[in-house]
């Protein structure tokens, strides 16, 4: 859309037939060669077909971010969670653009806990830029939190599913980020 606006063209002038099916999950958010295809179509006055092989697609993207996550959870003996804390460190590659925000939003989202503290840090490193895949940023942070919940359930001798249900967010629960 942005490319069409820049060129003062109507969206109706553009026809896109995506070959991939399913949701975006982050992988379809990146603009690859579309601006080039649009310019070639303008210059030639003909439709331009853009096809990327799987190899080209993977070369055009980047890796998911490396992360270092620290999660602390406090609870009563009956399994009521009293506090949750997370320190999330996400690599962004050579340029700032990691999915740290969604990681912070999702880390404790399923739970109704009054005391939550989340710190997030994005670190620029000498690696390729990261790309979005499969719920960008969420799997890394959620895996850390859910692993700690499993450990706590074992220590408390509570069924892990019952432990989660006991502390689950319900309609009207305010998220940690507001």
Predicted segments, located by residue:
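Structural alpha/beta core scaffold segments of enzyme domains
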Residues: 3, 7-178
